[in-house]
Amino acid sequence: MAGGGDHSQTNGGHVDQRALEEGRKEEFADQGCAAMVVSVPFIQKIIAEIFGTYFLMFAGCGAVTINASKNGQITFPGVAIVWGLAVMVMVYAVGHISGAHFNPAVTLAFATSGRFPWRQLPAYVLAQMLGATLASGTLRLMFGGRHEHFPGTLPTGSEVQSLVIEIITTFYLMFVISGVATDNRAIGELAGLAVGATILLNVLIAGPVSGASMNPARSVGPALVSGEYTSIWVYVVGPVVGAVAGAWAYNLIRFTNKPLREITKSTSFLKSTSRMNSAASA
């Protein structure tokens, strides 16, 4: 029995020493990669954003292209449903890995409200743009480059009209995202369903006017592949302004027991939440 106890203690010492050495190696690796923001979990997030944006664009823009090439067999409501379902499915597929942004405007909105690290923003945006461009390229190879098959977004009216509706619909989208995905009081399991339904509604509303982009990557990807840049600024400025405004609007109503001046001075809403929880427990 004594021998067994000694053996166990020796193994425990080796395990502790090995764990300590591994911890030091991980700490050194984290310090060495801090400036580059390169780690295995981060790379996994980037890959998830690439795949998520790719499949979202392939499904949504694919529906647009097929509907145009097959004399409207899918129909406009059908296209809206495809966009909503594609978003919902991909949120549930990779949301637990990367947060399922798939949208530079959403990522920027989270960063400005203190819910996403600024240093990771460029990599996320590049991943989203890459996924959107690759999906657009795939569709171009499959269906050709005829102008009537262009899966991008173009205003049907004035640029101002399209800009305003892009701001409003993206505001609506980001407001919903902030509510269902970042508020602990919300039912997180329904996030994908709520966001997908919001996309569906927005496409039905804004589709005939602006194409219902709500996402710079959704418009820039097809534009890069097709070389069609008409009014592209509308689909960059509109979603960015709408998303940032939507995120901040929800954050203003999130802290109902804090004075407005304290909310606006806070640079990190997560830190504010931590302070509120600490005060409540005290």
Curated annotation (Swiss-Prot):
Span of the annotated motif NPA 2: 215-217
Source organism: Zea mays (Maize)
Entries under InterPro entries matching the protein: Aquaporin-like, Aquaporin_transptr, MIP, MIP_CS
Gene Ontology terms: cellular component: membrane
Record carries keyword rRNA-binding: no
Biological role stated in the UniProt entry: Aquaporins facilitate the transport of water and small neutral solutes across cell membranes.
Keywords: Membrane, Repeat, Transmembrane, Transmembrane helix, Transport
Free-text comment about domains: Aquaporins contain two tandem repeats each containing three membrane-spanning domains and a pore-forming loop with the signature motif Asn-Pro-Ala (NPA).
UniProt-annotated location(s): Membrane
Protein name, UniProt field: Aquaporin NIP1-1
Transmembrane segments: 46-66, 74-94, 125-145, 162-182, 186-206, 232-252
Motif NPA 1 location, chain numbering: 103-105
GO molecular function: channel activity
Entry membrane topology: Multi-pass membrane protein
Predominant cellular place of this UniProt entry's protein: membrane
Stored Pfam families: MIP
Recorded family membership: Belongs to the MIP/aquaporin (TC 1.A.8) family. NIP (TC 1.A.8.12) subfamily.
PANTHER family reported in the protein's UniProt record: AQUAPORIN NIP1-1-RELATED, AQUAPORIN NIP2-1
SUPFAM superfamilies: Aquaporin-like
